[in-house]
A protein has these predicted regions:
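Short connector loops/turns at beta-strand edges and beta->alpha or beta->beta junctions
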Residues: 26-31, 36
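Short catalytic/ligand-binding loop motif for oxyanion handling, primarily in non-cytosolic enzymes
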Residues: 77-81
Length: 220
């Protein structure tokens, strides 16, 4: 593929054999007009839909380049035994309790339509679909072992929401020694200022906190 600048001094080469694309939480509850966040909370999907179009292009580009694709879903068991007290209270205090009844089923509960990936994204059999209970995709999952087994040490990260699961996963990947890129226009949030603030944090400090690119910069 090609060499991309990760900081003012360091570079790394993206090669399809050791690179994976992570598409984070493109679920109906977050991205569908009848999903929990839009229908029940009244959040605008304008920025999510804009990012979705770019994400679909990025997935197609990754397939063309034979890059491993990982789709993640924030999800919980129906009995909520995998929900920590901390997360339970945080979501409850934000008036978005995990398991709350929504138009597409219980919010972020496995087996309900709202928890599933949006129809526009159709995983192939060779793709990995990863259920996770926390914001970082590495917490309480086998993701790190999976990447080691596949000899994957470069990640291209996109998805929703920028400031939450995307940023948490991106920062965690760097702490684990991965070379990771966040594709900023392939990430979405419900508020443009919050999205941009997350991007600005990553691009501050001369690359110490990571690197973002646009989709055009990546594929060109």
């Amino acid at each position: 593929m090609k060499t991309l600048s990760m900081s003012l001094k360091d570079k790394f080469t993206l090669q399809n054999k050791n690179t994976a694309l992570m598409v984070i939480d493109m679920q109906n509850d977050f991205c569908h007009l009848s999903g929990y966040n839009s229908y029940k909370l009244g959040l605008s999907l304008k920025l999510i839909n804009k990012a979705k179009k770019k994400i679909i292009q990025l997935v197609e580009w990754s397939r063309y380049n034979k890059i491993q694709i990982i789709f993640t879903k924030e999800s919980h068991r129906e009995d909520l035994v995998d929900l920590t007290n901390s997360k339970r209270e945080r979501y409850k205090n934000a008036n978005t309790p995990i398991g709350d009844k929504g138009p597409m089923g219980r919010f972020l509960i496995r087996g309900y339509e709202g928890c599933e990936l949006i129809n526009e994204i159709k995983p192939f059999d060779k793709d990995l679909i990863l259920d996770k209970t926390e914001h970082s995709c590495f917490v309480n999952t086998n993701l790190q072992n999976y990447l080691k087994e596949k000899n994957i040490n470069n990640l291209i990260i996109c998805g929703v929401t920028t400031q939450c699961c995307v940023l948490s996963t991106y920062r965690h990947s760097l702490d684990l020694g991965m070379d990771s890129l966040l594709i900023e226009d392939c990430c979405g949030a419900y508020d443009a200022k919050i999205h941009q603030s997350a991007i600005n944090i990553i691009n501050s400090e001369d690359g110490v906190l990571g690197k973002t690119l646009t989709l055009k910069e990546l594929i060109n």
